[in-house]
């Protein structure tokens, strides 16, 4: 106490001065108290470590993926610059521009991608395949490795029997029960499977695939007869720029020069810095969500930090009161314990960073085959620094309040607080410091996101803050109701209700800690359940059995004849489809249109459109009027409302499309809302009759029929028309469902972090009131209560606490999920009572379990020592 005496005017000069120590007084006292170990700070440490580790792990993995995309950009794209054109090959001007690069020392490769039917010759099994035809220079970067060890050009070459070779993904061999050497019929040609594909360097850039890959040569594609006028083919042109033009600046300059030289080409341009924009966007969005979930876990842990400090201060009240009696000012008290808290926080942050840095590297072996890009996990300092900042700021935000309250309570009040804790607000400076720390967390979470992610981050934080507010109000409401109920006749219920609002009750901490995690879990579970229900249950009920794609007009009559001869046909829809880009909106070229980020996609590349005399099924007319069935006037078009709003246009404005070099301008006659979830045929653009009747087109047909005859119809149609691609809706839904299941599993796994944080905080909240619980139990036993009655009263208290928290959290999570499903995804909502029931029961059981563990320990204490100490 001599150090404090030195700072007290009343005691100045009464204590001997120590020599050889220049450490400031707050540091010395804090260090002495920390020598006693981390007892009382374990929950604090665990909460902080968990949140920091979650954020650091997610950041490290996403940084590794982003670095992989950047470093392997040339290989993933297949060139320095890539050009994608749908439906047609390059025209003379485009070809001349690309060839000029080759003449300067560059290289050019062309591939053609389309979906087709692959039929096994030996067993007539067939499946939808992703067909890719490549030329001799392919690939410009990277290497296609085959299981057979052959070179790609040898494997795809024409054999002595006249058949071209093909290499396939192993999944195709398994699905069709084939092996290398067997024959595969695609279109009008029978290929020999030469090998399975081990690695296709640019596979990631191709986007979502429904079927397995089949790779053939461009000469082999010509033999199939699949490419006709109107066929849905993606042509990819990849350039390797000359040696002196491969810097990032030179690549960017070449892309800009191309856009200026050929502004109306309609092709989609990508360079190696954005080789897989879909994956980059997905990784960014998932990483943002998981980081925000980790931040939520950290904030939930912050409640645990506050509880732990409150509990620690509660144990130190006598010491603090003694300090104050010796003349220690409030600022010194705050500094002593703030330094201790921050020292422990730094330990927790360090442990969390170590875990966050190690987890990706430990998981590399298991993740390598699952990740879409080559990734080398390493220590990424950026995510670790960010996680450390989050951890330290969270510790400050939740530590200042309880420490500031202890700072301003006088010594006599501290002694009285041992029996009945006082409730008072800290000084304005400490309130500002707390609010500033929370604001810093929010600003960091929003400022460090991409522009297109910012609104999501803002709404996530707003939702979290709203959940915090609702749960705090819930805790106050529960205590108010418990107080207003009065004194029930049942003793156990009376004790349970009194414990909910007694001084130092853990009600607020329990509701917050358990409620936030449960709210997030219910939200994710209900969103997952609704999506799964629509994809796996509702969509198959509404969707047709088949889509038949790339049918020619001349094939329509024999196709109808096959349908007439097939039993079980319930509905048939046939629609002409033309493809081309939207090149202008109200005479403004597509590249200059002021479109919102979420609608700009429709101005890039080719779009599918049709013409119709009648309003298509699944469309609702919102503005304007539909043309008469016998309309024969100037070109009119019906457009979808959400895109029109995003482009700032409406009825009376004009859209210009390009069909094989011919521009057609049409006036917008109406705006529609399309229900895409029906699984039927619909388009964003529907033209009036007479405009596109003679344009090159294919027929897209849907067939709904009884399941028993589906395979027979597929066999008959694909045998009769080798160029027609048959997409069985059930198989496509299975692929989408598998993708969704993987994504939801990852999100659920991360949400468990929040639940674990909540459980840790729950344990801390129970531990914080353990001393009071022991004293109450002893008094009740002395007054004659049996152990069973005391245990029953506490069990009822925890059951009420857990049940009330679960109901509110479940309701908040349900509201959040409802808004996401109906407003963001614009899908149908269904309440899933089982999810709600599991949440309520689980939360009640968890709360009772943790509470009764602590109560059992309290009931085991002997009465005499406790009473003597009090």
Which residue ranges define each predicted feature?
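Small-residue-rich transmembrane alpha-helices
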Residues: 299, 303-309, 342-373, 382-408, ...
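N-terminal Sec/SRP start-transfer signal
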Residues: 2-51, 278-281, 329-330, 338, ...
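Alpha-helical transmembrane segments
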Residues: 35-36, 40-45, 52-78, 88, ...
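Short beta-strand boundary microenvironments
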Residues: 125-174, 565-566, 570-651, 665
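Interfacial "coupling" helices/loops that link adjacent transmembrane helices in transporter permeases
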Residues: 33-37, 279, 287, 303-345, ...
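Juxtamembrane segments of multi-pass membrane proteins
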Residues: 477-616, 651-653, 657, 735, ...
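Membrane transport/envelope proteins' first extracytoplasmic loop
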Residues: 2-299, 311-314, 330, 369, ...
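Short cytosolic juxtamembrane segments of multi-pass membrane proteins
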Residues: 408-423, 859-870
